[in-house]
């Protein structure tokens, strides 16, 4: 379908030379009682908002004074921290966030409990006791006692001494000799043959001097009655006694040695 321009000079209907008619229709647009495009130019603000109608709205605050320059500066200063500082500050923030992520990846609790160790499995948050050693199994938090050594078995909680050791042993081990090989006291002072002989001689002299004093202190009547030499012993043979008299049962006779004094001293 083609459109052709229609040249008509009808002024009553207000149709100009810019009107068009269809080829299939014999009548024009003006003849069908339709408004021409020029009619819309008479009242453009009725159906469409023109640019001239929007201008008074923008200039409705034109009577107000302009704002002070100091207020604009304060507003701009306040808005500066909100804006990004630049590409140089981005790597620093990324590094801090990466370090926080790495530190948080190894921890699952508040006190630094390793990952995978839950409270339900028997793990505690105390750092002194190794993992897997619970209080119910007899393990304590004392660092000195080895694992598996309970108090009921006789082990103590001493941190410096292993179980079963002597208390004085570490003290003796601390005593160390000097680097020199010589003894602490010279041998000549400890063992002197001359000193020992003189000490023995003095003891013998004291004993010899004390013995006559004891003899002189004894009463004379006791010393005069006893003989100075012991009396001889007389041995009686077994032949003197007959077997029948000594052993009536017919058993073997035994020889007995009886000491007989030849002369008894007079006590008068």
Swiss-Prot record:
Region (Disordered), start-end ranges: 1-20, 81-171
Residue spans of biased composition, Basic residues class: 102-113
One Pfam family it belongs to: DUF5568
Annotated protein name in UniProt: UPF0461 protein C5orf24 homolog
InterPro entries: DUF5568 (IPR040419)
Annotated family: Belongs to the UPF0461 family.
């Amino acid at each position: 379908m083609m459109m052709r321009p229609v040249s008509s000079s009808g002024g009553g209907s207000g149709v100009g030379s810019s009107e068009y008619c269809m080829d299939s229709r014999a009548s024009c647009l003006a003849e069908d009682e339709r408004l021409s495009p020029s009619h819309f130019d008479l009242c453009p603000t009725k159906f469409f908002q023109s640019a001239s109608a929007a201008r008074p709205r923008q200039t409705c605050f034109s009577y107000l004074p302009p704002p002070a320059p100091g207020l604009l500066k304060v507003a701009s200063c306040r808005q500066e921290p909100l804006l990004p500082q630049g590409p140089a500050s981005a790597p620093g923030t990324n590094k801090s966030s990466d370090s926080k992520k790495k530190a948080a990846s190894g921890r699952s609790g508040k006190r630094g409990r390793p990952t995978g160790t839950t409270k339900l499995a028997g793990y505690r948050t105390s750092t002194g006791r190794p993992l897997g050693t619970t209080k119910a199994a007899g393990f304590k938090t004392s660092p000195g006692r080895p694992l598996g050594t309970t108090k009921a078995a006789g082990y103590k909680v001493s941190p410096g001494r292993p179980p079963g050791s002597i208390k004085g042993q570490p003290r003796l081990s601390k005593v160390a000799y000097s680097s020199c090989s010589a003894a602490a006291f010279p041998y000549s002072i400890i063992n002197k043959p001359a000193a020992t002989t003189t000490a023995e001689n003095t003891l013998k002299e004291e004993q010899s001097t004390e013995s006559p004093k004891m003899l002189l202190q004894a009463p004379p009547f006791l010393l005069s009655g006893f003989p100075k030499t012991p009396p001889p012993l007389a041995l009686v043979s077994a032949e003197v006694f007959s077997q029948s008299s000594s052993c009536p049962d017919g058993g073997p006779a035994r020889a007995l040695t009886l000491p007989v004094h030849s002369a008894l001293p007079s006590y008068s």
